[in-house]
Amino acid sequence: MCIRDSLSTYSLESGWYKFGGENHVVEINSIKISKDDLIIKLLNQPIKKSFALITPAVFGSNRLSFRTPQTSDFPKIKLMLTDKAIPYRHRTQGRLSRGRYAVPAGSVYVLEEPLDKSWWEWPEEWFPNEGISLKKIGSGLCLPLDIKGLA
């Protein structure tokens, strides 16, 4: 059995739901979070030169997946601590999405230049759009890190 906590900007009634590409049945227990809660404050902090993924990340186009956004406004990666890519699929409107590979949660990115944006401010163009932007379903949700000795 796997227990997973998730954040959602869309309110769900507590109960049992089918999720995932293979229709896994999960129990959802919704808890309202206020703007003053610690998790919201952490998620709203701008990312400087390092961050860690708390959900798997899929960046790139509808055809290709990458470890980072492939745009000129995303800083170059100086260092990256990660594991091998993981399979990633989602289901919307009764249809199973294209199989992709995602950067696993827990991966740490160190950037050459500060990003100065929280995850909420990241452009949707950084994520694939398959009828719905993968950002809207939480792809690449991350928290800033403060790594000592990192200039």
Please annotate each region the language model reported.
Residues R4-A151:
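Conserved active-site/ligand-binding neighborhood in enzyme cores
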